[in-house]
Amino acid sequence: MSKILYFSSGWCNPCKQLAPTMEKSGLPYQKVDVDMDTELSAKYGIRNIPTLVKVDANGNEISRMTGNNPLSTIQNWYNG
């Protein structure tokens, strides 16, 4: 099953704005602090935050989305 890696940071205002949306989404996700988990951030080449990376069960990237997007956009992206 796929899940979302939600790359974020405590100092990032758009990340803070996206947090409640992700909580309401009902989608499987793991929040990753780019300052704390630099290895995972580097693995996926994260350059901007917030970034959502959809991965398969093995951690292979399927697709990604950057920015503070509305819930419907995130759900359509994940389910598409």
Locate each region found by the language model:
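Chalcogenol-based redox active-site neighborhoods
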Residues: 17, 43-44
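Non-catalytic, surface beta->alpha helical segment in thiol-disulfide oxidoreductase systems
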Residues: 55-80
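Alpha-helical interaction segments
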Residues: 1-2, 34, 66-67
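Local sequence-structure signature of Cys/Sec-based thiol-disulfide redox active-site neighborhoods
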Residues: 1-25
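Residue-level detector of flexible, active-site-proximal loop/helix-junction positions
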Residues: 11, 36-38, 69
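Thiol-based oxidoreductase modules, predominantly thioredoxin-like and allied folds used
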Residues: 6-7, 26-40, 46-48
